[in-house]
């Protein structure tokens, strides 16, 4: 096989240490030379690792994406001008029965040396930092949804079926009623009806029927209040994250506005997309490769004339849900009915 990188390095990364193997292939021989060294993952030792690589004129490094342990190594080497390829572990998996830390780094380096390692997409630093915020926002929104469900279930077990009447348990009328039910006041039907607003006043009888016979212990009231406070706190944190994100994406406003011209994409979706794939689409080569990277394309798995599972992959953990949400919104878009007419 052709040697793509005459001088390169394979790195096996762990939580507390890494093993690096520099591979040098002489011009007059296909037999490579190996130099191995072990470093800790403290910044001082990572800089020594970078010094060692530069001393041997090794500017191409490959390591597998082991958890988050590769990130500090990548940060240091990137700052020192060393090109780092991050590989999916499934592409550099060592042969069973012949595996240890030293052999792993050598194996990774050997595969990389002859160009058999596919590089994972690593955006620039600004996009990576933005990605940390958007992914954290995704987690906060998930937590908020969990608290909403927990709040609703807390009333269900207390024989309150208000969620069967109102569309949103956190709407103005529903909030007023739930606050009243968890207060120390004795229940008064007339006062409860007076808390209803707008269209919900027409459902006053249904609201009372959904509440009639409820029983909430003091301990349950305390738990419900804690859940609400946590929900409100999460909402505040989401607003704080949004403020910070809007400051960070100021330089990408043109890209965001362009994305928002696509049916189904709003500002939040556009920011999520940019945070996941950046703004330079040359990284993917084609739209098909991008869809595959996002985990939206079916697999191709056939052996001996039998087709096996072709389900979509687990890739695109954060991008895929955003694009699926965009697709649902596009189908319901009345202003741009192309997808609505095509798929509904």
Pin down the residues of each PLM region.
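A detector of single, family-specific signature residues
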Residues: 1-344
């Amino acid at each position: 096989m052709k040697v793509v990188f005459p001088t390169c390095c394979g790195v096996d990364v762990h939580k507390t240490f890494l093993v690096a193997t520099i591979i040098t292939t002489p011009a007059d021989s296909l037999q490579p030379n190996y130099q191995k060294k072990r470093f800790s993952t403290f910044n001082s030792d990572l800089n020594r690792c970078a010094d060692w690589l530069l001393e041997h004129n090794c500017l191409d490094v490959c390591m597998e994406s082991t958890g988050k342990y590769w990130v500090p190594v990548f940060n240091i080497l990137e700052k020192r001008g060393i090109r780092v390829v991050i590989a999916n572990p499934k592409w550099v998996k060592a042969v069973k029965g012949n595996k240890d830390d030293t052999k792993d780094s050598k194996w990774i380096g050997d595969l990389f040396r002859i160009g058999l390692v596919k590089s994972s997409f690593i955006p620039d630093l600004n996009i990576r930092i933005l990605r940390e915020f958007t992914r954290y926002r995704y987690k906060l929104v998930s937590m908020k949804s969990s608290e909403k469900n927990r709040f609703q279930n807390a009333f269900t077990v207390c024989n309150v079926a208000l969620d069967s009447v109102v569309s949103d348990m956190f709407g103005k009328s529903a909030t007023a009623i739930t606050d009243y039910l968890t207060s120390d006041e004795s229940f008064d039907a007339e006062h409860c009806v007076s808390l209803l607003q707008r269209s919900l006043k027409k459902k006053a009888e249904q609201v009372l029927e959904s509440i009639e016979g409820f029983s909430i212990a003091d301990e349950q009231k305390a738990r419900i209040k804690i859940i609400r406070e946590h929900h409100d706190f999460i909402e505040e944190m989401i607003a704080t994250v949004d403020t910070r994100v809007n400051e960070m994406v100021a330089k990408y406003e043109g890209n965001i506005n362009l994305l928002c011209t696509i049916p189904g994409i709003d500002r939040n979706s556009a920011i999520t997309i940019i945070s996941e794939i950046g703004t330079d689409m040359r990284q993917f080569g084609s739209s098909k490769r991008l869809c595959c990277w996002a985990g939206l394309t079916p697999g191709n798995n056939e052996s001996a004339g039998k087709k096996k599972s072709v389900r979509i992959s687990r890739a695109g953990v954060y991008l895929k849900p955003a694009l699926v949400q965009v697709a649902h919104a596009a189908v319901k878009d009345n202003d741009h009915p192309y997808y609505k007419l095509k798929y509904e």
